[in-house]
């Protein structure tokens, strides 16, 4: 399904009973978080707060609060069908050479579709209906949430940050939270390996004394938002991927103050710069771990201009102990990851990121084991193949007779197929999320791999146990008898 913009998506959700308009006055300071959190935990609807206390701009919350709504936002009708998107990304990430002329012709439409999905620049856009510049810029006029009692202040939580490194044609889109510290000042909290931070670092090396242009889109269409959090190949822009999801090119408009291109249908666009050397302490804020993060210093984003629709909608969320919206996104995107991993490692049967593991900190992999030590190869592959799993602390690998998504099955495999000394892999001094206060050094910590597979000769000298299974004919006979037994 195609959505022209965020409002079109809101309309469809409302028709499906997946969006609730809240007319009662609700405070963006803490109250919205509590309401959204209770709603998400009940797998409830997206919420449009039409009367935020002290503000005239409505707030959209809990938009991606169920995996089903994430799938809808990506143009799919079910979470299961997201695997087709994963297969497309796997093909684009590592396209195999054609096996012959017929195979080449069969793949040509896919390549043509991708090549034709570059963004389309338009000369006028709804996101520039109203222009606010200079001293008129006042971010305090927007209903930016303060999510938790111990937060340092209001936090922009769904910003689509648009950057471009020096001499690069491709723009980067990423979601990096921003703390409000002044009428025109936000702290840009991006991790050092993320695309925006890499663009900024390259800019400083090439232009050390010049300000770095940045644009931030708030309330883009769902395909563009979700494209920014999907493992898109480096050769494919997030705008092009959003076009593939949508079935139409992403319309963009050139920013007034820079050459950056923002989504034309966005509700609000912040234009500005990061001045060389301007940093500020960020935090603490309640995070997706369920804890407040420690204070750290990040660049300051100076907003020089705001462009927006005449009556904009502010898109917001909160993060906290799972389940929260990032955890729900992780559940849905899990289905996208599976085909990408299977393309590189065909022996993988399933891959699961338990939402209780803060979206990415633990992974469970089931596989068709083929040789001794195979599980360890898969562990290393998970940690190294996709940058999304750079921070995954625990990888559990087991055989394909185990259901990766059933903890009873997984715990059974761990406790019956593992020797702790032999089957535990420890890797020290690896990149770790700086929010992980359990690591001994900020940004650097260890990883653990658990080989819960059946052991082959060479891995053990003992006779390995055989799993107990009832004969199929006995099970069939009991099925026929069951209604006569009076047990149910």
From Swiss-Prot:
The enzyme's E.C. designation: 4.1.1.98
Output the Gene Ontology cellular-component terms.
cytosol; plasma membrane
Q: Which residues bind prenylated FMN?
A: 175-177, 189-191, 194-195
Q: Where does Mn(2+) bind?
A: 172, 238
Which sites are catalytic? 287 (proton donor)
Q: What class of enzyme is it?
A: lyase
Catalytic reaction list: a 4-hydroxy-3-(all-trans-polyprenyl)benzoate + H(+) = a 2-(all-trans-polyprenyl)phenol + CO2
Specify the pathway. Cofactor biosynthesis; ubiquinone biosynthesis
The biological process GO terms on file are: ubiquinone biosynthetic process
Q: What is its main location?
A: membrane
Q: Where in the cell is it found?
A: Cell membrane
> Which superkingdom?
Bacteria
Question: Any idea which UniProt keywords this protein has?
Answer: Cell membrane, Decarboxylase, Flavoprotein, FMN, Lyase, Manganese, Membrane, Metal-binding, Ubiquinone biosynthesis
Topology with respect to the bilayer: Peripheral membrane protein
Q: How is the cofactor bound?
A: Binds 1 prenylated FMN per subunit.
Name the coenzymes or cofactors required. prenylated FMN; Mn(2+)
The yes or no answer to whether the keyword Lipoprotein is present is no
What is the similarity comment for this entry?
Belongs to the UbiD family.
Q: Enumerate the HAMAP family for this protein.
A: UbiD (MF_01636)
Question: What is known about what this protein does?
Answer: Catalyzes the decarboxylation of 3-octaprenyl-4-hydroxy benzoate to 2-octaprenylphenol, an intermediate step in ubiquinone biosynthesis.
Oligomeric state and interaction partners are given as: Homohexamer.
Name of the protein this chain belongs to = 3-octaprenyl-4-hydroxybenzoate carboxy-lyase
Native organism: Hahella chejuensis (strain KCTC 2396)
Chain's gene name? ubiD
């Amino acid at each position: 399904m195609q959505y022209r913009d965020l409002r079109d998506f809101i309309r469809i959700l409302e028709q499906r009973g997946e969006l609730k308009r809240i007319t009662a006055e609700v405070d963006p300071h803490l109250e919205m978080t509590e309401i959204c959190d209770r709603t998400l935990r009940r797998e409830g609807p997206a919420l449009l707060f039409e009367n935020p206390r002290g503000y005239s701009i409505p707030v959209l919350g809990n938009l991606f609060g169920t995996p089903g709504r994430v799938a809808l936002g990506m143009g799919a009708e079910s979470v299961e069908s997201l695997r087709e998107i994963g297969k497309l990304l796997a093909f684009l990430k590592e396209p195999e050479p054609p096996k012959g002329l017929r195979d080449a012709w069969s793949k040509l439409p896919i390549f043509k579709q991708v090549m034709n999905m570059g963004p389309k620049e338009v000369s006028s856009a709804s996101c520039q209906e109203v222009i606010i510049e200079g001293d008129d810029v006042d971010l305090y006029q927007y209903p930016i949430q303060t999510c938790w009692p111990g937060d340092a202040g209001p936090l922009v939580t769904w910003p689509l940050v648009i950057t471009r490194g020096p001499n690069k044609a491709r723009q980067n889109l990423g979601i990096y939270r921003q703390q409000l510290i002044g009428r025109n000042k936000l702290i840009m909290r991006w991790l050092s390996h993320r695309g925006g931070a890499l663009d900024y670092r390259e800019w400083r090396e090439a232009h050390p004394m010049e300000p770095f242009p940045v644009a931030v889109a708030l309330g883009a269409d769902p395909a563009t938002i979700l494209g920014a959090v999907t493992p898109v190949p480096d050769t494919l822009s997030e705008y092009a991927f959003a076009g593939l999801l949508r079935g139409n090119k992403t319309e963009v408009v050139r920013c007034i103050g820079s050459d950056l291109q923002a989504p034309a249908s966005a509700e609000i666009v912040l234009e500005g710069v990061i001045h060389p050397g301007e940093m500020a302490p960020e935090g603490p804020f309640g995070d997706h771990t369920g804890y407040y993060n420690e204070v750290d210093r990040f660049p300051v984003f100076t907003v020089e201009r705001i462009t927006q629709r005449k009556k904009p909608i502010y898109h917001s969320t909160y993060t906290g102990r799972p389940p929260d919206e990032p955890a729900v996104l992780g559940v849905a995107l899990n289905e996208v990851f599976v085909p990408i991993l299977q393309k590189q490692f065909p022996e993988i049967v399933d891959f699961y990121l338990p939402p209780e593991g803060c979206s990415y900190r633990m992974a469970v992999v089931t596989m068709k084991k083929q040789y001794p030590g195979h599980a360890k190869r898969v562990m290393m592959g998970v940690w190294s193949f996709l940058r999304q799993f750079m921070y995954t602390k625990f990888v559990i690998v087991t055989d394909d007779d185990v259901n990766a998504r059933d903890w009873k099955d997984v715990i059974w495999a761990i406790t019956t197929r593992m020797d702790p000394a032999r089957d535990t892999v420890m890797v020290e001094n690896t990149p770790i999320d700086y929010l992980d206060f359990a690591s001994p050094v900020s940004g650097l910590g260890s990883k653990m791999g658990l080989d819960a597979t059946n052991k082959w000769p060479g891995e053990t000298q003992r006779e390995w146990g055989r799993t107990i299974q009832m004969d199929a004919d006995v099970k069939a006979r009991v099925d026929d008898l069951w209604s006569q037994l009076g047990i149910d």
